[in-house]
Structure formats: structure tokens, C-alpha cells
């Protein structure tokens, strides 16, 4: 009898010892990770794992447990009452605006209600719902951002009328912008797979106090997933598979998280294969042949054809497909209770990416290029991120990030019926060290000081050569000889470095207002050397420049009542010319860009006002952000002479010379109005409308990269495990008179031609209707189905060479084990 009683006691104790609660979303019943659970005096604190589970054995039966998660309403319950809800806690979403924590504005954690800057956040769950093919496609659905595409393997984000090297890209605290980030259009955002993103944050407008050079139009911060120490579950496996019909996309992704007692690991592999892209068939713009591909080149590395091939389906954009491989490896190691270190390795590579812009160019009815493609676009990053919380009087917490990046780019071209093939290769090594520190200056933590430094060093190697191919029939059998061609950047090597210090102060003046101010000093250094003067001789073939800049910001947040928030901001930014600005030699559309060794920095002075109005207990909001930016000494392409000459022979073609030049002043102004929130139970909506205007004061010409009015509206319905939504996207027309025709950045030649006048029309207006649905088969398996561009509309995004996808059916499955 004693043994039976003892056995029953053991069973009872085991049952008590293994008390586990599962926390899920009230609407979707999706398990919630990182929910914080604590008792009344917070002597015991726990967190849910990826399955939403947490062990609550150590809490007293009489304890009141509080369940807290960013984005959800706090929930309290007596531990002994959990049995009545079957140990399942369902949390209700609260207003997104109240919940948002911003990581990028001060390079640390800050509530959005204490930030004057306009900021957008996209979470991992939203990324899963959007299911974008690339990170560029992800940016295209964020309010206030347009994405230009020269080819399928690309995507150049435009923020507040600025793009390329006027927009700063950052991944895991490391700046991606390097010495050869160019003006015009930049495609590097695709080198980060959206499948590994934990969140993406966009800061709109000049942010040079925290981020330094290039942060004029805004900052795009990518945060990749990081492993955690998890006592509940040691292994987490995720698999994603997606198929899209418009370009025969096949994406497969797998990631594995291992959590041990003293360290954790996250490994991710993503592979995407994209076929040729089909454009829409319905031409509401009434230009019957605009964008159609009637002929294409079937030339390859080994196959020679002196003429183009007729395309049996002109709506299929031949020579657009490519594939891409992305790898991510992270190790997280807690060193002690006050410090931890994260090792981060990223690698992205691709196949050759066809340059559709060139391959589709037709001259006198014939294709201009037989071969035009980018070689594999390789990006490697290795970083070490040390976090520490010493809690000193002058340093409460901080981080040090040391990073190394290697970027490889190449361009291979051969004109139709020519035997001369041109090769240009660029290699960039980037070293950086960032230190970011913060401290609360009082016990209430309403006075905060942050400060830090940044050191970067870029080394650029550029080489170029030509080879004459040997042909037998239609086969390329080898090469007959080599010949000299002009390199894209200085062939003697070049370097670009920066050093900066900053400080930022934030104070809650009272319960209704917050003041923020900051200042940064940055110094940049550039060295470049040209050796070969076969084609071009500069006034100085060996240059050494240094530029200095002080930037500042002043922000004020005022909340007169609970329903209103007013943000005012004055800020400045700058961009120091890099190697691409000063030293690039490049041909396009009859013009060749040549070096200008006398180029100086450009500056931006910005004023903006933001207003937020909340409704229905902050479950719905309307917001307005307006701004005016003055560009001083701004850099743009213009007519330029080399040794008194306005022409130059480039790859055997005589072209008119131009260069990046400093002009006096220009302005950009505009704004975005948006709304988001709950209409009724289970039904949510959001939308935005963006207007941008830019013009030079001295030349009285429109600025490049200024998109027409654009916006979107969407409705989303959620019921338990089912979610569905519709999205309407629209874009106004941009007329010829609103284009800058001097620079050639906006690709006016990619717009339709009016038959009556023979002039370019500009970008026609367009709109698309899109539908998506998601269903949770279980807490481990979810299915998604989308139809983009339901009416199969033909259109091109502003300044794009490639037509947008036509009707696109997208199927995906997500499995978490």
C-alpha cells in the first residue's frame, strides 16, 4: 500500500513539474514566440518558445501571471485558473502603432511614440503573408516607396524622390553601401533573401546623424533572424516552398535553429529559380506594341548567331530569367549575464543576370546586343556583434560590430554580329567597425543619451579586357586575340574611407512631449589612380581627396491628447562622392560618363511635419507626413569636356561625354497620407497615397527619380485559421514635360511613342487588383494562395525597362517543425 501511495505521489509531482501553457493569437491561433510571463513582483520571468509554450511550474498556484507581447494586449490570470482554459492563453492584438518598437532610428530600442522621424516596419509574419520573390519586391509594397527595375534580377528603391547611392542600405547593423554604389539605379537589395528577414525598417528622409553619408532619401534596415537560447525546445526546422506562374518561379528555403545550453545556431539556405517573365496582355493604355519583345538574342558563351530570333510570344520577355542562392549562418553565445556575442556569416550568389535593358534595345529594326549580362553577383559578409550591459553611470548598454564584406560584380557585352566581347570586373573589399552606446541619465529613464562611432574602409579593384571570339558555323570555339578596353573604375586601384563620431539626446519634457537632438561629425577620404591612358587622359591621373561634414537633427513630439500625436523634425544630411561618382567611365544611349576629379559633396536640409489621429481606442489611425528638402551643391549628370573634347570613343563607338557635376540648389517636397486599423471585428484595412515633386532652382528642370502619384488600398479579413484580403495598387501618369531628359536616368526611351508627333509619351497610368488567402492547416503547416494583377494589366513601373508581371498565380507552403 505504501508503494502505491508513493507511486501516486510521484505521478502527481511529475504532473505538477511539467505544467506547460501554450500562448496563441486570439484570431489565428498561431503560437506566439517570446511572450513574457511574470508574477506580480516580477521575481520570476519566463518566455515562450517558437511553439508558444512555456513551463510555469516554478510559479505559485496563487500567483497572478501576466502575459505580455509586443503588439498584443496584456493578459492576467491566476495560475490555478489556467486549468479552466485548458492551459491555452489567447492574446488579442492591440493597435499596431502603440506596440511598435523601433530599432534603427537610434541604433537601439526605442518606442515609436518617442520618435519624430517617419518610420515604417514590416515584421516577419507580414513578410510571410506578402511572400515576396525578392527583398526589392518586399520594399515595393511599403508606403512611400517605389521600386525601379532595369531587369528581373534587380530592384532600385526610390524614397522621397531619391534612389541608388542617396538611399542607405543596412543589414544587421552593417552598412551595405560601398565605394561603387552608383547614381541612377542600384540593384543590390536583391542580395538579401526575404526568407531570412526578422523585420525590415524604413527611415524616411535624411538620417546622417546616426548613419553618415548616403542617408539622404532614407535608410533601409534589414534585420535577419537570430537564434536564441531556448530551454523548452532544442531544435526548430522551417521549410518554405513557393511557385509563381508569371515567371515560373520556384523558391525553396530551409532553416534550422539549434538551441543548446551555452550557445545557439541558426542556419538558412534559400534557392530561387526565375524563368522569363510574362507581361500583362490587357493594354488599357492603348499602346498596342509598347514593351513587347518581338525578337531576342539566342547567343550564349558558346553559341553564335549574327541576327536576332523572332519571338513567337511577344508578351514573354525573353532573356530575363536567372537563379540565386542565399546562405546565412549565425551563432549566438551568451558570455555572461551582461554580455553576449553573435557571429554572422552571409553569402549570396547568382547565375549570370541578363541585362534586359540592353538586350531589348533595337536600332534600325535590329537588336543592338548579342550578349549583355551581369556575371554572378556575389556578396559575402562576416561580422561579429558584441552586446554588453555593464550598467555604468556613463554606459548602460552598448554594442560593437566588426564586419568584413566582399562584393564582386562583372559586366560582359558583345554587340550583334560583332566578334568583340568586352569583359569588366569589379571587386570591393569593405572593412567596418561600429560602436553604439547608450545610457539613461536618470532613474525614470526619460532622459537618454546615445553616442558612438563608425570607421569604414573600401578597397576597389577594377579590370577590363576584350577578347575576339573564334567562330565555326554557329559555334564559338575559342578566342583569336586579346585587346585593350577601358576599365569601369580606376585601373590602378582606389580606396574610400570614412571616420565619424555622433551623439544623440532624447528627453521626455513632460507626459505630452518629447525632444530629440543629435549631431555627427564625419570625415571621408578617397584615393584613386589611373594607369592606362590609351582612351582617356585626366588632368590628374592620381587623386587624393578629403571631405568633412557636420550634420544635425532636432525633433519634437507632442501628444496634446490621447487621440493626437504631432511630430516635427529639422535635419540635415550629406553624401560624399565615392569612387563611382568621381571615377566611373560608362556608356549608355549614345553618351559616355567620364570621371570628374573635382566633384564635391552634396548636402540636404530637411524640414518635415507628421500628424497622427487615432480613433476607436487607438485601433484605427490616419497619419500624414509632409516634408521639404533643399539639396545644396547637388550632384547630377551634365555636359562635360575631357581635354577640350565633347566626344570619346568607347568600345568602338563614338559617344558624347558627360560627367557627374555639382549644381547649385534643388528642392524635393511631398508627403504621404495613410490609414490603418480595424473597421469591425476580424476586418482590417490600410492604405496610403504619396506625392513627390522635385526641381532644380538653377536649371529650372525636373529632377530625376521623381515618381508620379502612387498608392494602394487593402482590406483583410481574418477568422480563426483563415485569412483573406484584396489589394488595389495605383499609379498616376508621368508626362514627358515632367522628365529630366538631360541625365537619362529615368529611361524616357522605355516609354511609348505617340504616333502623331513621334515624341515619347511618358509613363502611362496603371492600376492592379490583387487577392491573397492563407489557411493554417495546423500550428505547424500553413498554405497560401495569391493572384497578383488579376486583370492581367500591362504596365511598367516608372523608369523601369522591364514590363511588370502579368496575371500571376502564387502557391506556397510553410512548414514549421
Please give the residue ranges for each predicted region.
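Short, acidic, small-residue-rich periplasmic hinge/interaction motif at the N-terminus
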Residues: 36-40, 68-72, 84-128, 164
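N-terminal periplasmic accessory domains that precede
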Residues: 85-90, 135-138, 155-158, 169-170, ...
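Short acidic/polar hinge/loop motifs at secondary-structure boundaries
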Residues: 176-206
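Outer-membrane beta-barrel signature, preferentially recognizing the C-terminal barrel domain
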Residues: 245, 369-391, 490-494, 541-559, ...
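Transmembrane beta-barrel wall of Gram-negative outer-membrane proteins
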Residues: 247-273, 284-351, 378, 443, ...
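Face-selective signature of the C-terminal outer-membrane beta-barrel domain
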Residues: 334-348, 377-533, 549, 557-560, ...
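Surface-exposed extracellular loop regions of Gram-negative outer-membrane beta-barrel proteins
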Residues: 349-351, 406-410, 523-534, 544, ...
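Gram-negative outer-membrane beta-barrel transporters
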Residues: 511, 523-524, 627-630, 640-643, ...
Amino acid at each position: 500500500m505504501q508503494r502505491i501511495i508513493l507511486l501516486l505521489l510521484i505521478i502527481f509531482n511529475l504532473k505538477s513539474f511539467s505544467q506547460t501553457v501554450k500562448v496563441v493569437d486570439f484570431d489565428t491561433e498561431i503560437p506566439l514566440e517570446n511572450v513574457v510571463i511574470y508574477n506580480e513582483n516580477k521575481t520570476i520571468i519566463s518566455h515562450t518558445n517558437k511553439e508558444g509554450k512555456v513551463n510555469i511550474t516554478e510559479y505559485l498556484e496563487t500567483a497572478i501571471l501576466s502575459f505580455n507581447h509586443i503588439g498584443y494586449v496584456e493578459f492576467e490570470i491566476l495560475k490555478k485558473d489556467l486549468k479552466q482554459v485548458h492551459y491555452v492563453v489567447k492574446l488579442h492584438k492591440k493597435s499596431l502603432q502603440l506596440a511598435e518598437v523601433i530599432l534603427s532610428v537610434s541604433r537601439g530600442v526605442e518606442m515609436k511614440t518617442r520618435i519624430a522621424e517617419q518610420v515604417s516596419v514590416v515584421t516577419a509574419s507580414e513578410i510571410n503573408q506578402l511572400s515576396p520573390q525578392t527583398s526589392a519586391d518586399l520594399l515595393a509594397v511599403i508606403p512611400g516607396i517605389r521600386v525601379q527595375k532595369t531587369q528581373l534580377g534587380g530592384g532600385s528603391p526610390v524614397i522621397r524622390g531619391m534612389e541608388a547611392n542617396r538611399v542607405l542600405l543596412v543589414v544587421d547593423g552593417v552598412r551595405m553601401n560601398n565605394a561603387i554604389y552608383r547614381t541612377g539605379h542600384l540593384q543590390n537589395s536583391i542580395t538579401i533573401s526575404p526568407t531570412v528577414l526578422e523585420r525590415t525598417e524604413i527611415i524616411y528622409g535624411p538620417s546622417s546623424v546616426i548613419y553618415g553619408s548616403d542617408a539622404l532619401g532614407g535608410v533601409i534596415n534589414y534585420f535577419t533572424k537570430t537564434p536564441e537560447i531556448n530551454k523548452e525546445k532544442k531544435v526548430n526546422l522551417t521549410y518554405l516552398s513557393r511557385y509563381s506562374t508569371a515567371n515560373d518561379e520556384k523558391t525553396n528555403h530551409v532553416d534550422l535553429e539549434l538551441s543548446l545550453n551555452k550557445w545557439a545556431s541558426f542556419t538558412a539556405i534559400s534557392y530561387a529559380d526565375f524563368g522569363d517573365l510574362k507581361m500583362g496582355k490587357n493594354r488599357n493604355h492603348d499602346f498596342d506594341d509598347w514593351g513587347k519583345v518581338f525578337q531576342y538574342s539566342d547567343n550564349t558563351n558558346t553559341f553564335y548567331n549574327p541576327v536576332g530570333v523572332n519571338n513567337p510570344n511577344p508578351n514573354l520577355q525573353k532573356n530575363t530569367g536567372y537563379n540565386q542562392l542565399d546562405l546565412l549562418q549565425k551563432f549566438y553565445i551568451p558570455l555572461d549575464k551582461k554580455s553576449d556575442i553573435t557571429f554572422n556569416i552571409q553569402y549570396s550568389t547568382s547565375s549570370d543576370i541578363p541585362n534586359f535593358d540592353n538586350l531589348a534595345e533595337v536600332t534600325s529594326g535590329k537588336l543592338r546586343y548579342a550578349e549583355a549580362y551581369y556575371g554572378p553577383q556575389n556578396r559575402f559578409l562576416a561580422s561579429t556583434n558584441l552586446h554588453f550591459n555593464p550598467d555604468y553611470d556613463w554606459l548602460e548598454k552598448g554594442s560593437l560590430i566588426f564586419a568584413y564584406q566582399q562584393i564582386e560584380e562583372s559586366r560582359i557585352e558583345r554587340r550583334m554580329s560583332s566578334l568583340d566581347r568586352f569583359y569588366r570586373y569589379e571587386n570591393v573589399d569593405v572593412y567596418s567597425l561600429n560602436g553604439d552606446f547608450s545610457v539613461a541619465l536618470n532613474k525614470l529613464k526619460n532622459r537618454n543619451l546615445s553616442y558612438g562611432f563608425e570607421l569604414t574602409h573600401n578597397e576597389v579593384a577594377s579590370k577590363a579586357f576584350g577578347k575576339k571570339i573564334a567562330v565555326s558555323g554557329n559555334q564559338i570555339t575559342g578566342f583569336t586575340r586579346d585587346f585593350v578596353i577601358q576599365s569601369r573604375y580606376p585601373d590602378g586601384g582606389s580606396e574610400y574611407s570614412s571616420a565619424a563620431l555622433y551623439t544623440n539626446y532624447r528627453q521626455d519634457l513632460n507626459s505630452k512631449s518629447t525632444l530629440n537632438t543629435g549631431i555627427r561629425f564625419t570625415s571621408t577620404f578617397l584615393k584613386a589612380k589611373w594607369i592606362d591612358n590609351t582612351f582617356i587622359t585626366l588632368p590628374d591621373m592620381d587623386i587624393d581627396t578629403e571631405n568633412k561634414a557636420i550634420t544635425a537633427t532636432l525633433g519634437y513630439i507632442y501628444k496634446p491628447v490621447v487621440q493626437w500625436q504631432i511630430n516635427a523634425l529639422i535635419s540635415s544630411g550629406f553624401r560624399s562622392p565615392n569612387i563611382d561618382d568621381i571615377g566611373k567611365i560608362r556608356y549608355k544611349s549614345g553618351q559616355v560618363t567620364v570621371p570628374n576629379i573635382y566633384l564635391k559633396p552634396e548636402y540636404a536640409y530637411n524640414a518635415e511635419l507628421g500628424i497622427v489621429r487615432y480613433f476607436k481606442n487607438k485601433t484605427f489611425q490616419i497619419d500624414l507626413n509632409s516634408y521639404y528638402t533643399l539639396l545644396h551643391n547637388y550632384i547630377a549628370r551634365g555636359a562635360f569636356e575631357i581635354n577640350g573634347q565633347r566626344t570619346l570613343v568607347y568600345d568602338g563607338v563614338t559617344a558624347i561625354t558627360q560627367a557627374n557635376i555639382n549644381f547649385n540648389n534643388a528642392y524635393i517636397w511631398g508627403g504621404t497620407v495613410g490609414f490603418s486599423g480595424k473597421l469591425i471585428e476580424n476586418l482590417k484595412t490600410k492604405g496610403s497615397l504619396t506625392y513627390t515633386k522635385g526641381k532644380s532652382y538653377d536649371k529650372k528642370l525636373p529632377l530625376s527619380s521623381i515618381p508620379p502619384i502612387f498608392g494602394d488600398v487593402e482590406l483583410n479579413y481574418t477568422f480563426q485559421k483563415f485569412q483573406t484580403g484584396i489589394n488595389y495598387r495605383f499609379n498616376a501618369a508621368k508626362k514627358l514635360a515632367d522628365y529630366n531628359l538631360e541625365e537619362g536616368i529615368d529611361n524616357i526611351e522605355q516609354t511609348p511613342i505617340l504616333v502623331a508627333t513621334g515624341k515619347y509619351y511618358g509613363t502611362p497610368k496603371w492600376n492592379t487588383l490583387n487577392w491573397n488567402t492563407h489557411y493554417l492547416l495546423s500550428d505547424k503547416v500553413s498554405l497560401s494562395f495569391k493572384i497578383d494583377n488579376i486583370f492581367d494589366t500591362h504596365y511598367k513601373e516608372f523608369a523601369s525597362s522591364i514590363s511588370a508581371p502579368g496575371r500571376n498565380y502564387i502557391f506556397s507552403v510553410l512548414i514549421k517543425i
